[in-house]
Design a protein with these regions (language model features):
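Inter-domain helical "communication" segments and dimerization helices
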Residues: 2, 9-12, 42-43, 73-77, ...
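Conserved beta-hairpin
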Residues: 52-89
């Protein structure tokens, strides 16, 4: 099974960038009109806008369960500094547990696998940029892997 939210991620990034440009342009218009209070309010709105985007941690996610391995590639769609590309890959037999935690409209995936040194838990992966159907498909695929071990 293969799941990718590439199209949705591109749309999210495009919308974020266009909205950010509009906010900055409004701020520049207020600056040109010498409306200092409006410039400060616009700067505050922009800071809150960027802060919310960083808090949401919307990620591009590629999920694949073929060839007896689970492969998950992900990176933040909206990143101020630099993108950190991450990859998780493990054999189906190594999967010990997984949890999809939903809170405040966001979903995070946590995976635990068996290694030579014991059980290791990967950092949470934000699934907030995926649709409910895609999250459900990932959950079903991982549940099936757990059953078939």
């Amino acid at each position: 099974m293969e799941i990718s939210n590439q199209k949705r991620s591109k749309q999210i990034k495009k919308t974020f960038n266009l909205t950010g440009i509009v906010i900055v342009l409004v701020g520049l218009i207020f600056l040109w009109l010498k409306q200092d209070t409006a410039v400060l309010i616009t700067a505050g709105v922009f800071a809150v806008y960027v802060g919310i985007a960083q808090f949401a941690n919307l990620c591009y996610v590629y999920f694949n369960t073929e060839n007896g391995k689970v492969l998950i590639r992900y990176y933040p769609v909206i990143s101020i500094l630099k993108k950190e590309y991450e990859t998780i890959e493990f054999a189906h037999s190594a999967l010990v547990n997984f949890n999809i935690e939903k809170a405040m409209g966001f979903a995070d995936l946590t995976i635990a696998i068996r290694t030579k040194r014991g059980i290791a838990e990967y950092p949470s992966i934000s699934l907030a940029a995926l649709s409910k159907a895609e999250i459900s498909e990932i959950s079903l695929a991982l549940s099936e892997i757990m059953r078939n071990k």
